[in-house]
Amino acid sequence: MSKLSNISAIKIADDFGADQFHDDAMLTLLEDGKIDGVSIFSELLNEENTRKLKNLKDTHSIQIGLHFNLTSGDGLPNVSELLRNAISRSLDVDYVVDSLVSQLNIFQSKFGYLPDFLDGHQHVHSFPLINQVVSK
């Protein structure tokens, strides 16, 4: 049990950028120190919330990560279809790489630096093939 006492839990809220109601709640939790960071949909994040997150990072040392998205949005497969394609190895790896690079570039253009961490919307970062891409 003593080894566990050296481990600290990091509390991260995901889906930041999906809608203003939840974004406002997460901003309040960050300001109050109730959570340690957020993972964002880089393609959905607006300028005002980008500014607020930058300020909180400066004043509260929060973590801001990329919430890698391959399943939510027009023209994207649902999570079941994506998982089937990943397991059967029929997933287009170039598409995954291009999506990741695009989302990282958007993040960097908004914040001026790369994310503190990366996770996946609907845990897609743990799917076969996708986990190999995000691990590189």
Positions of PLM-derived features:
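Histidine-centered catalytic micro-motifs
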Residues: 11-16, 66-68, 117-127
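Acidic-and-aromatic substrate-binding clefts and catalytic sites of carbohydrate-active enzymes
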Residues: 16-20, 40-50, 72-73, 123-129
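Structural preference for beta-strand elements that scaffold enzyme active sites
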Residues: 8-10, 35-39, 61-67, 114-117
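Catalytic domains of cell-wall/extracellular-matrix polysaccharide-remodeling enzymes
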Residues: 108-136
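Boundary/entry segment of secreted carbohydrate-active catalytic domains
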Residues: 1-21, 26
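Acidic (Asp/Glu)-rich catalytic clusters
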Residues: 2, 26-33, 47-65, 105-111, ...
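Alpha-helical scaffold elements lining the catalytic groove of polysaccharide deacetylases
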Residues: 90-105
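Active-site gating loops and adjacent loop-to-helix segments of metal-dependent hydrolytic enzymes
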Residues: 73-94
